[in-house]
Amino acid sequence: MAETKIPRATAKRLPIYYRYLNILLDADKKRVSSTELSEAVKVDSATIRRDFSYFGALGKRGYGYDVETLLAFFKKILNQDTLTNVALIGVGNLGHALLNFNFHKNSNVRISAAFDVNEAIANTVQSGVPVYPMTELKKQLIEQQIEIAILTVPTTVVQKITDDLVDANVKGIMNFTPLRISVPETVRVQNVDLTNELQTLIYFIEHYGQQLGDNGNDDENETED
């Protein structure tokens, strides 16, 4: 069976569904309707049904969705059975927070290596994660076969480090810097600008007020690719 190509907006919602299905399973819930899912995850039911339709018949009319079956399906789609090692580049305040967090609630993802220019941090272990000097970046990424990296570095060096990541065969970058980095088409970048997100939130509150809808989660219902 050929791999299903789905819109980016749908792909962003899949982990939300998966997380809530785990909650339902823990509560010994056997089945769930799209309406129940909608109320829980704040995504309208039509969007949920459309998202699920990309994967074929996941539910039954009049019955809803079998929680255990649906959870097993999304577990496979989201690669939850495979451990993904991630590199953290930059162990400043944000980097330390990410190391402390280290995706403990998502056991298939972990930061397994960190890198920093600070000699006081390099060659130490922080929150159970080894921190290497930046001079070892490419070597360690290649040897450890790490293909995902998180960037929390100054904007003055982010593009140079990005180029090094590409040279080390990194396939995906989560960029916490405000700079938009340049990468080949074969590399996926997810930009996370906390300042921009906060400014956007303030703008919507100031200019739209209650027009966003009952829950204000309009972004969860987007349908564009």
Swiss-Prot record:
Main location: cytoplasm
An annotated GO cellular component: cytoplasm
Location in the cell: Cytoplasm
Name of the protein: Redox-sensing transcriptional repressor Rex
HAMAP family xrefs: Rex
Family the UniProt entry places it in: Belongs to the transcriptional regulatory Rex family.
SS bonds (residue pairs): none
Known role: Modulates transcription in response to changes in cellular NADH/NAD(+) redox state.
Residue ranges the UniProt entry marks as DNA-binding: 16-55
Residues binding NAD(+), per UniProt: 90-95
Complex and partners: Homodimer.
Entry GO MF terms: DNA binding; DNA-binding transcription factor activity
InterPro entries registered for this protein in UniProt: CoA-bd, NAD(P)-bd_dom_sf, Rex_DNA-bd_C_dom, Tscrpt_rep_Rex, WH-like_DNA-bd_sf, WH_DNA-bd_sf
Top-level taxonomic group: Bacteria
Organism listed in the record: Lactiplantibacillus plantarum (strain ATCC BAA-793 / NCIMB 8826 / WCFS1) (Lactobacillus plantarum)
GO biological process: negative regulation of DNA-templated transcription; response to redox state
Keywords, sorted A to Z: Cytoplasm, DNA-binding, NAD, Repressor, Transcription, Transcription regulation
